[in-house]
């Protein structure tokens, strides 16, 4: 199944890339546990890492600080390794409300969650690839340090089918039920199977467009074939197939029975403690809730909130780390921590927040003490589990620098010859009017501007002021969700507006070559938003444009400003020197605008059932208001056909969207007639 990593790129390493690749590979081969790649914005850090992976042929996990950057990295790695297994592993919750108890108001909040089926399929695909192949790159978020099913139990539960194998049809169906597959002879979808005579069709949980057909003759597997679940067309005939469980948390029956006995023992011990402390209500609550869960586990093999008993189900002792995605990574795997100055502190913070919430649940009798072991990894456990690691950042944190022993691989020269932005410091007193004149200069030559402020209030007031003066401006704030945020960034790049105002959102990983000016208001107010790293990251947003410039408005130069300006000057000098020595003229990046959103949409939206190919739907806004009645009628017929098509494919959400649009078009048609 595995193939060698094969890098697909029209470019060869250039600038600082060849030296960075050589040093990183030497370090890995010498057994260095930690290395840091200091790569400036736009220097091709992902390409450097892809070259290292391809040269060393090692399975790799890439950790990103959020889903947006993970999606961007996943898309880039997919392009670099089209023939290899590039997988995506992030939290599959679109919405998640953990269970919690607020003692002050005696309020218990039930767990509530909405799971994105497509991301669940991608997670299953990621672990399958890690177990089966060596040519695998998994792009993950911090979700990777949360508990996952034990890989040993997961492997034990697999169902292997081979042609010529002697097995009873009922035995196959029983095994599929144990893997949590559901029988559904009407709607054939991911994680289900259907039976027609001696033919069993199985839709693997980790697949989105291929299903398995098992043809039996008496008690022998006569033929195994892969087919398209939408058309029913046979794609290929195969000699063997492995069916993986529908979920990572599947457990063999004997393990569940053993776990139930251990849960009963813990319940008896905990009841004794609560009664000794005269906590009668808590004792009664805990007994009732746990007995209900045990009954469900006995009857169904699982219960709601079964993850709270994960310590017993995986056979771990108290306080032992939970199995995570790191347990699926081979021993010689490689870990790349992207934007490490953000990702590393995130990993450290996850355990403490989770622990505080669960201690309250245990104290007030909502959960057994063993629920505390259903948790993310502690930071020291992450350190112990992490294989050889490369930290990647334009502004590495103290932790990474300390771990790398101060020996940092510098990647400052960009292949395009682009220089770091010119930095100017201007007085605060006239900052708004000065900014307005700078914006007008940029808008006149079709370039974009980013403005970062210190407070929400100031961002709102500035946006209003710029609008009053005729500028096309938008305001980006924390209440905007990820998809809308991506759309705003796309609109900025497309020139729908010229100025984007934000607070702390215009930083890591945003790829906007059209931005030629970054303005930082109140740059001399020392603090988190104006620290050396924040300033360098924000200034870096203008580094992808030939005319890149950053204006820092401040009445004095703070230590953070001095360090940020000094570091930018150091990089700029090195870049200029390299360009002069090699006769390079800086070239602006001409990156397609669709790149940002196309991938995010594929991942963010649950793919349709069956074939799983979501079709683009025309938005109502895209229909011109002045269409003739004849054109409107034609449009209505088109959309009616598309709606019926979606309905036949059981894609009811898409069909409903078109139905709502048809109502609007019919109203327009009546008005126009």
Swiss-Prot record:
Gene3D superfamilies the record matches: P-loop containing nucleotide triphosphate hydrolases (3.40.50.300), UVR domain (4.10.860.10)
SUPFAM superfamilies, sorted: C-terminal UvrC-binding domain of UvrB, P-loop containing nucleoside triphosphate hydrolases
Intracellular or extracellular location(s): Cytoplasm
PROSITE patterns for this protein: HELICASE_ATP_BIND_1 (PS51192), HELICASE_CTER (PS51194), UVR (PS50151)
Residues annotated as domain Helicase ATP-binding: 26-183
Boundaries of every Helicase C-terminal domain copy: 431-597
GO cellular component, one term: excinuclease repair complex
Region annotation (Disordered) ranges: 608-627
Coiled-coil region: none
Keyword field contains Iron: no
Keywords (A to Z) from UniProt: ATP-binding, Cytoplasm, DNA damage, DNA excision, DNA repair, Excision nuclease, Helicase, Hydrolase, Nucleotide-binding, SOS response
Transmembrane segments: none
Domain of life: Bacteria
SMART domains, sorted: DEXDc, HELICc
Record family assignment: Belongs to the UvrB family.
Comment text on domains: The beta-hairpin motif is involved in DNA binding.
Quaternary structure and partners: Forms a heterotetramer with UvrA during the search for lesions. Interacts with UvrC in an incision complex.
Reported function: The UvrABC repair system catalyzes the recognition and processing of DNA lesions. A damage recognition complex composed of 2 UvrA and 2 UvrB subunits scans DNA for abnormalities. Upon binding of the UvrA(2)B(2) complex to a putative damaged site, the DNA wraps around one UvrB monomer. DNA wrap is dependent on ATP binding by UvrB and probably causes local melting of the DNA helix, facilitating insertion of UvrB beta-hairpin between the DNA strands. Then UvrB probes one DNA strand for the presence of a lesion.
Protein name: UvrABC system protein B
């Amino acid at each position: 199944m595995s193939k060698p990593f094969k890098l697909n790129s029209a470019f060869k390493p250039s600038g600082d890339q060849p030296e960075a690749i050589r040093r990183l590979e030497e370090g890995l081969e010498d057994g260095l546990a930690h290395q840091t790649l200091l790569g400036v914005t736009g220097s091709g850090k992902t390409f450097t890492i892809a070259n290292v992976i391809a040269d060393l042929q090692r399975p790799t996990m890439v950790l990103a600080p959020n889903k947006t950057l993970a999606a961007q990295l996943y898309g880039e790695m997919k392009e670099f390794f089209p023939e290899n297994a590039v997988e995506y592993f992030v939290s599959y919750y679109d919405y998640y409300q953990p269970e919690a108890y607020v003692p002050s108001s005696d309020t218990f909040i039930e767990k509530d969650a909405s799971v994105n089926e497509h991301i669940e399929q991608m997670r299953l695909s990621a672990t399958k690839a890690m177990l089966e192949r060596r040519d695998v790159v998994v792009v993950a978020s911090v979700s990777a340090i949360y508990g996952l099913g034990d890989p040993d139990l997961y492997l034990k539960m697999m169902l292997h089918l081979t042609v010529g194998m002697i097995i009873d049809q009922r035995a196959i169906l029983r095994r599929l039920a144990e893997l949590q597959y559901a029988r559904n002879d009407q709607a054939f979808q991911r994680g289900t199977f259907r039976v027609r005579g001696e033919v069993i069709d199985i839709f693997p949980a980790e697949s989105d467009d291929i299903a398995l057909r098992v043809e039996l003759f008496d008690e022998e597997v006569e033929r195994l074939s892969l087919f398209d679940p939408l058309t029913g067309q046979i794609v290929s005939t195969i000699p063997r197939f492995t069916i993986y469980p529908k979920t990572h948390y599947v457990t063999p029956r004997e393990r569940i029975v053993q776990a139930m006995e251990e849960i009963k023992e813990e319940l008896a011990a905990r009841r004794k403690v609560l009664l000794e402390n005269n906590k009668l209500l808590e004792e009664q609550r805990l007994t009732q809730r746990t007995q209900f869960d045990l009954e469900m586990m006995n009857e169904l093999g699982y219960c709601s909130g079964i993850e709270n008993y994960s310590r017993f189900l995986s056979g771990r002792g108290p306080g032992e780390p939970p199995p995570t995605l790191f347990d699926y990574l081979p021993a010689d795997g490689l870990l790349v921590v992207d934007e490490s100055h953000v990702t590393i502190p995130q990993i450290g913070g996850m355990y403490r927040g989770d622990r505080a919430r669960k201690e309250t649940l245990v104290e007030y009798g909502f959960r057994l003490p063993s629920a505390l072991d259903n948790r993310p990894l502690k930071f020291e456990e992450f350190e112990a589990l992490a294989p050889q690691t490369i930290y990647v950042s334009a502004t590495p944190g103290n932790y990474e620098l300390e771990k790398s022993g101060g020996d940092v691989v510098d990647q400052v020269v960009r292949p395009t010859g682009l220089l770091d932005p010119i930095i100017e410091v201007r007085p605060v007193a006239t900052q708004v009017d000065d900014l307005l004149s700078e914006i007008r200069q940029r808008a006149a030559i079709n370039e974009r501007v980013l403005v970062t402020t210190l407070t929400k209030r100031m961002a709102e007031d500035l946006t209003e002021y710029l609008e009053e003066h005729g500028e096309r401006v938008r305001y980006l704030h924390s209440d905007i969700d990820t998809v809308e945020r991506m759309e705003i960034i796309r609109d900025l790049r497309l020139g729908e507006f010229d100025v984007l105002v934000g607070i702390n959102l215009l930083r890591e990983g945003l790829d906007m070559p059209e931005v030629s000016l970054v303005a930082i208001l109140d740059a001399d107010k020392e603090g988190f938003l104006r620290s050396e790293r924040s300033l360098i990251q924000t200034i870096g947003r203008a580094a992808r444009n030939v005319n890149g410039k950053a204006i820092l408005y401040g009445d004095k130069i703070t230590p953070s400003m001095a360090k940020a300006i000094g570091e930018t000057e150091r990089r700029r000098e090195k870049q200029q020197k390299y360009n002069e020595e090699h006769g390079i003229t800086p070239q602006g990046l001409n990156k397609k605008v669709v790149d940002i959103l196309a991938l995010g949409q594929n991942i963010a939206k649950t793919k349709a059932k069956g074939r799983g190919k979501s079709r683009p739907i025309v938005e109502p806004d895209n229909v011109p208001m002045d269409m003739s009645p004849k054109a409107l009628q034609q449009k209505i017929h088109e959309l009616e056909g598309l709606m019926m098509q979606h309905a036949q494919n059981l894609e009811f959400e898409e069909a409903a969207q078109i139905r709502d649009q048809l109502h609007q078009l019919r109203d327009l048609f009546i008005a126009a007639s």
